[in-house]
């Protein structure tokens, strides 16, 4: 390869299980094969006493070196070590994940010593491999790329992916959403048409799942809504089959292979192969010689059995479809095309469930499900680097959206959304806040992402402080908060105090959020389910604030000597007693909004009576 630098950019689909790379020049997209001739490369990195292997070579020797072969790193990136999904995944991973300041690190033996790598570093190794595959074909050094992420990735996961790109030595021109990239591949390919239409992208990969509804007209691709599950894919279907095989092996041999990483890796590889076979045939046999403790393993699996083992997971993929249609306000009948993306959409049962959901509608299979995302990323890379010269990309415009609302925590840990979910990016939104205490000179701005009223049920993205601000009475300062989401879906927040002009900002990066999958997957549906709780939480907080504010005013009245003298004997005592009852009610954690309102009313009556009978 020459030292000359390629003036274009490559498109990389950085997948959980497999990755893919492509280029776009003129009007031609090329998916680039690796040295084995495959168009997809396993997202595996293996460490040995002598070397580091990436891709096919790493996956091929995973069974011999399970503790030092890392995969599934996309399920770690941008997450906290204490995330329940990380904990659950760790149970099945043969490699070691350790806690370092709340962040997960992969621990391996490499070149004779123990090394710890962050998920970003492992992802960067896969990106370097994809870059090298492209360089071998182009014959020049590649420095620029567009990388894809699941549409439902939060801010932490997006920023971490961008960081992985930087670690790999790539200038990441853009982070784009996988279903949007696939829509470009479809919209510019066989699905090209000037007619306006609603296209549903159903993207089920090895480890993540996205559904996006786009409106496509000419070269304008507008995402109307997006939903998904950042922790569901083909790997999970393999695991369900693997668990069935483990039980069958134990039943036949009375031996438990759960603790043997090598046996589990061999069995998982056989399960993945069986799953693929069952997409074409109706039955297959898993056969592994000397699987564990000298025992051979053989099991016949039918397609029906595989579908039964994954029944819940398969049906669950329809929930985000329902969510997307609801959010977009589009009826099933108004969906013109359903496009399948991701290797797992080859499973016949998945196709049947989806087609039945849309009343037997024919599914669109004209694009290669493994390559569509890289194809779209390459088109975007070509446009951004000036390599795309065709007429069909001249008017290409991508309008993507924020998958979950972004905002700040107010007094009482109430979530104040600044950018609602579904907002087209890039965007700039402003909202004004004020202080809660007299002479307050410091204001904290905790930033969250999610759909719940109570911030503790959303994802923390980090916080920053605005200080010092001029001391004023509570409620007087005007604090303007600006949320700016760029084309990569990455957030920058700025807060300014208007009189002094003092400002502070944060680009949310590496302040990794405590994201549990159950939160990100169910945030919207939970928000519906717990709406009553959320409303009660808000009402109680407002009632509490009102009562506290009124008590403060009454205290001012009775402590003012001129006003106090005007009160009849006994009236002041009545007010004080009523006020004590109200304060006691405030202390009770289980008080409802109504309880607090009643106490406020009683206190108002006591004050009114005392004043009117002077």
UniProtKB/Swiss-Prot annotation:
Residues 393-403 are annotated as: Inter-domain linker. It is found in: Nucleus; Cytoplasm. Keywords: ATP-binding, Chaperone, Cytoplasm, Germination, Hydrolase, Nucleotide-binding, Nucleus, Stress response, Virulence. A motif (Nuclear export signal) lies at residues 575-583. Residues 1-392 are annotated as: Nucleotide binding domain (NBD). It is an enzyme of class 3 (hydrolase). GO terms for molecular function: ATP binding; ATP hydrolysis activity; ATP-dependent protein folding chaperone; nuclear export signal receptor activity. ATP binds at residues 16-18, 74, 206-208, 272-279, 343. It catalyses: ATP + H2O = ADP + phosphate + H(+). It comes from the Eukaryota. Residues 517-613 are annotated as: Lid domain (SBDalpha). One of its GO terms (biological process) is nuclear export. Residues 404-614 are annotated as: Substrate binding domain (SBD). Chaperone that interacts with the histone acetyltransferase HAT1 and mediates its translocation from the nucleus to the cytoplasm during germination and starvation conditions. Within the cytoplasm, HAT1 regulates autophagy via acetylation of the autophagy-related proteins ATG3 and ATG9. PANTHER family: HEAT SHOCK PROTEIN 70KDA (PTHR19375). This is Heat shock protein SSB1. It comes from Pyricularia oryzae (strain 70-15 / ATCC MYA-4617 / FGSC 8958). The gene is SSB1.
